[in-house]
């Protein structure tokens, strides 16, 4: 066993009589013993069909209590789990299967029926405490060609997870995370969030994603805490789920925070249950939360927001705001990570100049599964994000280097402009893009998702322009303004800027 799998097994034994994971869809808690029994059942099944160290497993499941036990069983054998979105269409699954050599595919029931006639795989059903019917497709052709030996045991440098990057700026990259990297990341999370066995976390984020996989699930399990799993986020159920299950923290994205602020039913339920809600904090990541929403959420729901900065390549977070020393608008301070700003070939850790954020540490990858050496230099991972440190050592992220707008030689950082304009009351969300322009090369373009406002577009444009004139440099002001009902997004709520740009170009 690796250090990681040994700790996971030990926690189940320590808490074998205790409720550890609740599946809200089933309305059922599972004890450490029940979870350990499921891990053993899956371990034996996978061993019987011939899975070996570093075999690949494709997983397409909804959030549920079976996810953590499936992952642990894979890791104990050294199998590399590659989870994908539960909404992945069958055609995309088949493309993934054909491009890579998977030993097994684990899918939800709706996809199993479609997949049966599409792939030359053997279908098996495994019954567990956490899932009465877990459908597993076996690549018998691959496994039958194996020599009759038991293979090697997993070690610290073997891959445990392959995750696709969120792919908001192009084709997703495959990120491979080793047992060592995953274990290190989880313990950095435990330390920085001060997690203990007294904590209970609510998972509403998709479990194929690094946030739920490592920050919420793995870190909580290694700290001995409890996990409550929702199939997906529901504004009308959120505060009830927090209250009834004594949740002490949860990890979300700014989109969820925005919804909770404007959803009348959620606000009504909170007002009725607030005496029974004892959150230590709500963790927010993926993209920056506008200051007015940050303040409004903390004031209305009487809990702290902790913003951080991380990515799949760092196996979760690299920075986090200290629990008792938050700085609004920042991504916090480095956590178990060396973070620097690359400016003119120099790695700066002080000063306030903007440059590319680079990171290194014991939880950061050294290459992609499909090698991309240009993403690394001198032991640093080049994130492609722009940012700076303030005088107190807090990191401020200003956007992607690829998103930087070049207006006639003057550079505009979209995130900074978005942060300022989002203070306008009628703006729910705003995206600043560079659109083709014959004169300047790129035109600063604002795309606004308004709140339910009684203002007409002409009035909103006038207010936006007046506010920009008062608060932005002339070259930062938008010369084009569009209004949309919503933005194209990935499964975690990130806005897909390339798709948005294509939509605007087609108008």
Which sequence ranges carry the predicted segments?
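Gly/Ser/Thr-rich phosphate-binding loop
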Residues: 247-252, 265-326
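Conserved ATP/PPi-binding loop(s) of AMP-dependent carboxylate-activating enzymes
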Residues: 330-336, 346-377, 410-412
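Conserved AMP-binding/adenylate-forming core of the ANL superfamily
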Residues: 20-50, 55-64, 71-72, 89-94, ...
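AMP-binding/adenylate-forming catalytic domain of the ANL superfamily
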Residues: 470-494
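Conserved pre-ATP/AMP-binding loop-to-beta segment of ANL
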Residues: 16-19, 145-164, 171, 194-200
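Conserved AMP-binding A3 loop
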Residues: 29-33, 160-184
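AMP-binding/adenylate-forming catalytic core of the ANL superfamily
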Residues: 361, 367, 386-476, 499
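Conserved AMP-binding/adenylation subdomain of ANL enzymes
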Residues: 183-200, 208-249, 263-264, 269
């Amino acid at each position: 066993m690796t250090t990681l799998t040994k700790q996971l097994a030990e926690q189940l034994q320590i808490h074998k009589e205790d409720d550890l994971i609740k599946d809200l869809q089933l309305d059922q808690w599972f004890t450490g013993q029940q979870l350990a029994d499921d891990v053993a059942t899956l371990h034996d099944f996978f061993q019987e069909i011939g899975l070996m160290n570093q075999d690949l497993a494709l997983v397409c499941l909804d959030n549920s209590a079976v996810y953590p036990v499936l992952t642990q069983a894979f890791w104990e054998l050294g199998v590399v789990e590659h989870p994908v979105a539960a909404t992945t269409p069958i055609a995309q699954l088949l493309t993934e299967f054909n491009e890579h050599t998977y030993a097994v595919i684990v899918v939800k029931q709706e996809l199993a029926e479609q997949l049966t006639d599409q792939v030359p795989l053997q279908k098996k059903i495994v019954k567990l405490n956490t899932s009465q019917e877990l459908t597993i497709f076996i690549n018998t052709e691959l496994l039958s060609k194996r020599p009759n030996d038991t293979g090697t045991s997993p070690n610290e440098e073997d891959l445990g997870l392959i995750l696709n990057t969120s792919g908001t700026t192009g084709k997703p990259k495959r990120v491979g995370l080793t047992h060592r990297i995953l274990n290190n990341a989880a313990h950095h999370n435990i330390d920085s969030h001060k997690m203990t066995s007294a904590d209970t976390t609510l998972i509403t984020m998709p479990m194929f994603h690094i946030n739920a996989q490592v920050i919420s699930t793995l870190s909580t399990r290694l700290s001995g805490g409890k996990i409550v799993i929702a199939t997906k986020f529901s504004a009308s159920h959120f505060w009830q789920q927090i209250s009834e299950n004594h949740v002490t923290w949860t990890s979300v994205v700014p989109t969820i925070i925005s919804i909770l602020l404007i959803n009348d039913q959620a606000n009504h339920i909170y007002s009725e249950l607030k005496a029974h809600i004892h959150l230590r904090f709500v963790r927010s990541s993926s993209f920056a939360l506008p200051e007015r929403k940050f303040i409004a959420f903390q004031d209305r729901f009487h809990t702290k927001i902790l913003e951080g900065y991380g990515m799949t390549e760092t196996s979760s977070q690299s920075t986090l705001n200290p629990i008792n020393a938050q700085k609004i608008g920042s991504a916090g301070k480095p956590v178990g990570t060396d973070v620097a700003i690359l400016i003119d070939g120099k790695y700066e850790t002080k000063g306030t100049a903007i440059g590319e954020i680079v990171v290194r540490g014991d939880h950061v990858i050294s290459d992609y599964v499909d090698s991309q050496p240009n993403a690394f230099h001198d032991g640093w991972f080049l994130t492609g994000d722009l940012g700076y440190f303030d005088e107190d050592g807090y990191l401020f992220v200003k956007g992607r280097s690829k998103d930087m707008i070049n207006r006639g030689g003057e550079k505009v950082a979209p995130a900074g402009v978005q942060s300022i304009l989002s203070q306008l009351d009628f703006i729910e969300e705003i995206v600043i893009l560079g659109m083709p322009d014959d004169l300047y090369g790129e035109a600063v373009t604002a795309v606004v998702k308004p709140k339910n406002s009684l203002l007409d577009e002409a009035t909103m444009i006038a207010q936006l322009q007046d506010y920009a004139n008062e608060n932005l440099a002339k070259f930062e002001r938008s010369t084009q303004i569009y209004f949309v009902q919503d933005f194209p997004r990935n499964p975690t709520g990130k806005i897909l800027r390339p798709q948005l740009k294509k939509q605007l170009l087609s108008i």
